[in-house]
């Protein structure tokens, strides 16, 4: 049965019935109008509820939920800034490695033989990559002036031009389907990262990129795929459940670990400092939110700040 539409007064009453403290209905109406009930309440209520009664813990206010929402909003902005930096590096490294091997003709990246065709699935995936994600840029008019310029003036769109218009998801797929020598050339750009490890990172980072781009809840997001085990998992003594590391595989800390390997050291230190500042601010501003709860949901071990104390290899 579909959930019924609720007016703002009904939404406020529903929250009060669940033990949320609201003393100013007019201010609460403005808040719900600005953020939207589903995005704000459904997205961020869990940390404030009693797991047994499903009601809000005593003293929880609408401002507490808004504070967590704003933390996540700022976390998305910070994360996306550095995701774009990694993305830019991967674009450059991929186009250079591919064109060094196969040349500047657009026919090179449209040729299935220039990808890894090993296995039952790869040939089909390569064909899908070419026909759905690469060829349309050449056979249809696009919104990218630089692509149209190369088509009309030069009759050729080299990969180093096209690659800027590709989504991070397509870029990740191109890496996954690349020949081993191309993957090796790209992974060498990053200290201590092997080909398979980079592929798993790109797959996970793509999911986080989509969460940021679509304003979804980020801090507690988990991907279905894992990043590969890394030396830092062991060096930081991340606890294990059997052979599986508990933290840093498909949670936000997996993204932090990936950034540690894929960002220049100076940039990672800046990112880490800004991240720590955000978490500390969220802890100070939210009386109902224990910092340990937030870190747990983000997949952070207690010693996460020591990530830069260890060598990456």
Predicted feature residues:
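Long, contiguous internal "core" modules enriched in hydrophobic/ aromatic residues
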Residues: 1-313
């Amino acid at each position: 049965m579909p959930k019924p539409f609720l007016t703002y007064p009904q939404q406020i009453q529903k929250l009060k019935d669940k033990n949320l403290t609201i003393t100013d209905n007019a201010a609460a109406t403005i808040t719900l109008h600005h953020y939207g009930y589903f995005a704000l309440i459904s997205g961020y209520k869990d940390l404030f509820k009693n797991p047994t009664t499903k009601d809000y813990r005593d003293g929880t206010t609408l401002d507490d939920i808004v504070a967590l929402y704003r933390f996540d909003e700022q976390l998305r902005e910070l994360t996306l800034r550095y995701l774009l930096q990694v993305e830019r590096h991967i674009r450059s490294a991929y186009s250079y490695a591919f064109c060094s091997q196969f040349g500047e003709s657009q026919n090179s990246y449209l040729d299935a033989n220039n990808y890894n065709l090993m296995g039952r699935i790869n040939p089909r995936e390569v064909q899908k990559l070419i026909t759905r994600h690469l060829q349309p840029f050449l056979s249809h008019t696009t919104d990218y002036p630089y692509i149209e310029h190369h088509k009309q003036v030069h009759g050729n769109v080299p990969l180093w031009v096209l690659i800027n218009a590709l989504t991070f998801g397509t870029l990740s797929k191109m890496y996954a389907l690349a020949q081993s020598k191309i993957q090796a050339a790209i992974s060498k750009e990053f200290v201590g990262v092997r080909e398979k490890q980079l592929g798993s990172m790109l797959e996970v980072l793509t999911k986080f990129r989509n969460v940021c781009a679509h304003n979804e809840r980020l801090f507690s997001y988990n991907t279905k795929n894992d990043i590969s085990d890394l030396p830092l998992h062991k060096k930081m003594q991340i606890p294990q459940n059997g052979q599986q590391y508990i933290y840093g595989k498909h949670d936000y800390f997996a993204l932090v670990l990936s950034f540690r390997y894929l960002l220049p050291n100076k940039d990672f230190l800046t990112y880490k400092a800004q991240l720590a500042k955000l978490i500390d601010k969220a802890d100070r501003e939210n009386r109902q939110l224990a910092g340990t709860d937030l870190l747990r949901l983000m997949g952070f071990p207690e010693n996460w700040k020591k990530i830069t104390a260890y060598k990456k290899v």
